């Protein structure tokens, strides 16, 4: 494979020295970019973008062409590709977000679920990864990703997104055996899916545990973290002559950083409710940290964005082990110029912390 021209993202995840703090944005290929909206219109809909490797490659590269400061590309896809490949029938309702034609509500439903083969059932994702990796030609590393078992389970049991997860939590407490079987099947599926992405060319992987923070402390350990640990222990950690770093991101997981840091990943993602300096003091000896600016800061003026970037960099302090990111995905209404101001500020203001 082509040598990497910019590997500071991978170096920071492994806490190796860097010249400036690397930066990327969750959902950096997204609706805030006019070029993305044009590609989506051309493709017809969101799933057509995801399922066509050429379109997925095109939109993955758009933010990199616009912002030379980006230190990583992330595969353009959706976390719900796995449940879709299990036969749940993913579709998108305008204004409603993702929905499933089938829901999982009984032990029999769960027992009937297949474990998808990443190459046969999710081949379009593997094709997208290899296409993007080829087109990147070593510019920056490519991040692969998946949803966590708990997060995927919530969509499968609720039939879509939910405010209170009442069906999923009822299953968890009424029928823990069924929930554990579902999570175990999902953990196996995620492990093979991420390993498929690594073999296809992903140079780091992130597990998005978007809804883990909605669990009680005890339930989080048993029904979310335990299954992410299982995945991490089964991942390919070296490929193509390089280590493949793993990032775990539990939104609203700041109370549990110590136990997440024991899961075996290289880095933890932080949402904006955490103080990154405090997080470093607690777990920085074990893992790198990624984050964690409030995405809505991007609605403020560029000077205010720059001030907030400076505050977060100062809070983390000197040395490597920090990948700058937002605390969640960039939102569709953000002005692309403000995103550019954010990215420039990270590189300009962080050099002093790496001397």
From Swiss-Prot:
TM ranges: none
One Gene Ontology biological process: protoporphyrinogen IX biosynthetic process from glutamate
EC numbers on record: 4.1.1.37
InterPro entries: UROD/MetE-like_sf, Uroporphyrinogen_deCO2ase_HemE, Uroporphyrinogen_deCOase
Annotated compartments: Cytoplasm
A single GO molecular function term of this UniProt record: uroporphyrinogen decarboxylase activity
Metabolic or biological pathway, per its Swiss-Prot or TrEMBL entry: Porphyrin-containing compound metabolism; protoporphyrin-IX biosynthesis; coproporphyrinogen-III from 5-aminolevulinate: step 4/4
Any one cellular-component term (Gene Ontology): cytosol
Keyword line: Cytoplasm, Decarboxylase, Lyase, Porphyrin biosynthesis
Residues in the signal sequence: none
Swiss-Prot/TrEMBL site (Transition state stabilizer) positions: 78
Enzymatic reactions: uroporphyrinogen III + 4 H(+) = coproporphyrinogen III + 4 CO2
SUPFAM superfamilies listed in its UniProt record: UROD/MetE-like
Chain sites annotated for binding substrate: 27-31, 78, 155, 210, 328
Pfam families recorded: URO-D
Oligomer and partners: Homodimer.
Annotated family: Belongs to the uroporphyrinogen decarboxylase family.
Function noted in UniProt: Catalyzes the decarboxylation of four acetate groups of uroporphyrinogen-III to yield coproporphyrinogen-III.
Name used for this protein in its record: Uroporphyrinogen decarboxylase
Organism: Pseudomonas fluorescens (strain Pf0-1)
């Amino acid at each position: 494979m082509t040598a990497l021209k910019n590997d500071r993202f991978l170096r920071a995840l492994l806490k190796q020295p860097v010249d400036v703090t690397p930066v990327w944005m969750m959902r950096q290929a997204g609706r805030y970019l006019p070029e993305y909206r044009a590609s989506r219109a051309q493709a017809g809909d969101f799933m057509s973008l995801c399922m066509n490797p050429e379109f997925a490659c095109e939109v993955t590269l758009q933010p990199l062409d616009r912002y030379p400061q980006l230190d990583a590309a992330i595969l353009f896809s959706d976390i719900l590709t796995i449940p879709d490949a299990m036969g749940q029938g993913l579709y998108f309702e305008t204004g409603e977000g993702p929905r499933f034609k089938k829901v999982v509500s009984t032990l029999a439903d769960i027992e009937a679920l297949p474990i998808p083969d990443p190459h046969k059932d999710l081949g379009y994702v593997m094709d997208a990864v290899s296409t993007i990796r080829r087109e990147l030609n070593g510019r920056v590393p490519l991040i692969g990703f998946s949803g966590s078992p708990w997060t995927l389970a919530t969509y499968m049991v609720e039939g879509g997104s939910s405010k209170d997860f009442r069906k999923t939590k009822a299953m968890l407490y009424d029928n823990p055996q069924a929930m554990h079987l579902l999570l175990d099947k999902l953990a196996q599926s995620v492990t093979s899916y991420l390993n498929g992405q690594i073999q296809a060319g992903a140079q780091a992987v992130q597990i998005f545990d978007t809804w883990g923070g909605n669990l009680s402390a005890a339930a989080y350990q048993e029904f979310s973290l335990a299954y992410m640990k299982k995945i991490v222990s089964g991942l390919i950690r070296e490929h193509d002559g390089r280590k493949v770093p793993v990032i775990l991101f539990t939104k609203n997981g700041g109370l549990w950083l110590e136990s997440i840091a024991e899961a075996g990943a290289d880095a933890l993602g932080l949402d904006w409710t955490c103080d990154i300096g405090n997080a470093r003091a607690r777990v920085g000896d074990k893992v790198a940290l990624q984050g964690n600016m409030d995405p809505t800061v991007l609605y403020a003026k560029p000077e205010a964005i720059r001030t907030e970037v400076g505050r977060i960099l100062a809070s983390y302090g000197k040395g490597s082990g920090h990948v700058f990111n937002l605390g969640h995905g960039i939102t569709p209404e953000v002005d692309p110029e403000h995103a550019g101001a954010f990215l420039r500020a990270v590189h300009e203001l962080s050099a002093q912390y790496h001397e």
